[in-house]
């Protein structure tokens, strides 16, 4: 995990299931400035793959991703 990537905004998607974490991440990315980082917490098993795929397709960068038990923490930097 890249700890130097300080989040500008944090989303708590614990308890939400596909596609809700993805929808919230899209809105969260739109709400931050280019260069800032969005932090997302989720426990949906599909969230990691969905959020990584979203970031890649949208032209953003995943700067960190870790699992703590069944809880995902992912950091996405807005690039455009």
Where are these regions (language model features)?
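Amphipathic, hydrophobic secondary-structure cores in small proteins
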Residues: 11-66
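Core SAM-dependent methyltransferase catalytic element
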Residues: 73-80
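Short, flexible, glycine/charge-rich loop motifs used to bind or transfer phosphoryl groups or to couple energy/partner
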Residues: 1-2, 28
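Right-handed parallel beta-helix/beta-solenoid
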Residues: 2-12
């Amino acid at each position: 995990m890249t700890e130097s990537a300080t989040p500008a905004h944090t989303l708590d998607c614990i308890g939400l299931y596909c596609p809700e974490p993805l929808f919230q991440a899209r809105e969260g990315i739109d709400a931050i400035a280019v260069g800032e980082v969005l932090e997302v917490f989720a426990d949906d098993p599909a969230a990691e793959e969905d959020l990584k795929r979203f970031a890649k397709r949208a032209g953003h960068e995943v700067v960190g991703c870790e699992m703590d038990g069944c809880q995902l923490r992912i950091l996405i930097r807005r690039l455009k």
